[in-house]
Structures are given as C-alpha cells and as structure tokens.
Amino acid sequence: DVYKRQVVTYQTAYLKKYYPKEFLAGVLNNRIDKIDEIAKYVVYMKEKNIAVYPPDVNKSKAYFSVQGDGLRFGLCALRGVGIGAMEKVIEEREKNGLFKDFPDFLMRCIRFLNKKMVESLIFGGAFDSMGKRRSQYEAVYEDLMKRLAAIDKQKMSAQMSLFGDIIQEEAPKANYPDIPEWDTTEKLSREKSVLGVYVSGHPFGAYAAHFTDCNFHTGLLADYEEDEETGDRTYHQIKIDDKVTMGGIVAAVRKINTKSGTIMAFITIEDLYGSVECVAFPRIYDKIKSCLLYTSDAADEL
C-alpha cells in the first residue's frame, strides 16, 4: 500500500509539472457534477495563469478539454443541462457539422433539450460566438422552441403518413429584438449561477486596480496542507489578530437578531479569487450597515 501511494504521488507530480492543463482537465472531469468544486479549481487555474474559456456549443466537448493555452468548459459542467442531453448535442455536431446559428442549433437538438437547458446555455455564454447578445437569445428562445416542437411533431406524423407530406427542413428565422445586452452585473450574475464562477469577466474587475495596497485576498484562503490533486502547499504570513485589508464586492448579507435585541451580520465578500464570509458584530454592523445598501456592483474595503 505504501509503495502504491508513492507511485501515485510520483505520477501526480509528474503530470502536474509536465502536463498541467491535461492534469487539471482530468481533475475537473472527475468532478463534472460538483459545481462548487469546479469553481475552486477554476480559481486555481487563474492563479497559475492557465486560461479558462467559456462553454461554446461549437467548440466545447462534453467535458473539460485542453484548447490552446488553457481549458475550455465542457457543456456538461453547466448547472441544469443534464449530462445525457449534452452528450447528444456533441454527437449531433460531430455527425452533421457545426451549428450555423441559434435556430439551427435548436432545430437539430430540439428532441433532447428543454427550456431550462437552453436557458442555462444562454446564461453560460455557450452561444456568444454566434453573434447575438445573450439578452436577445433569451428573448426569442421560448418562441423558437414552440415553433420547432410543432415542426418536429409534423415530421413525426409525416413519417407515419402514406402521403409523405412535405415538411419544412430549414430552421425558422429568429426575430431578434433590438435590445441592449444585460448590464454587467446581471450578465455576470447569471453566468455564475450556471457555471459556479465568473468566466467572461468579474464584477469587481473594474475596481481591483484601486485595491493593490491591500494585504489580503481570498486566494490566501487556499488549503495550507498539500492539496491531494494539485500537490501544492500554500502558506502565508498573516497571523491571528493581524489587521487585514481587502477589496471586494458585497455579494450577500445575512442579518441575525441577537439575544440582546441588536443586529449582527454575516457578510459575503467576493474578489477576483473567490469569496469569504465576514462577521460583523452589532457595534461594527451599526457603523457599516449604510454601506451594505449597495448592490454587488459597489466595491467596499472592509
């Protein structure tokens, strides 16, 4: 057993050093249905300057894959899509070629997709390369799916008909409204809701340059013992009772009434590396509560 563990440790170290992207792809694919763990390793990749590419119906495989200088999200990694359905999407693309546009995708995949799956793909940016805005895809997908479901039903009936009715073979055109993209906060929030992490940007990104003198960020919260997958050991010099400063956005505030009738709060702060929950006891909460009225596009130093 000791010998086997040593062999595994050596193999892990070798792969991590010489094939880091392939190694991490394997790690992520072992956790393809655990979105919180995927988020942890995506943050790790960003720290190691390994590019993370968003899902794309014409470029992604079912699982995470190495592409260029980084890894691309697999379609199966999105929350709410279903592994079986995404494998069928990949199979359709490999058999009949790239999807020409959004209606073409829906027409060819309508039999194994539902509205929630399509919505998740939109939120995750899987159609961005097709040239329209996510807000436009969201505006038309339900109507398109209804029309395509009716066409598909006609096709099924025609196959059973003696007369072989002529049925529309081309995808119907989408009537995209001329509307702006969602604002940055909403776009990134929806993206994170299905990917577990921000990929195309970060709501704190516009403010990060103003916080370079802070002595703490959430990347320092990595495990201090050796990580079983990456083999890394992480240590830092911040000690208990040290004063720390960090820059981040207020992502969530959970207020609690204390026994004495005062209010304290648990505040989730997000920065470019991840998130951390801070505790504001009643005296501190009373001082900062006015700052917590901002939405997540406001940066606060705590």
Language model region names:
Residues D297-L302:
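A short, hydrophobic C-terminal helix/tail in secreted or cell-surface proteins
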Residues K4-S296:
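Noncatalytic, beta-rich nucleic-acid-contacting surfaces in large DNA/RNA-processing enzymes
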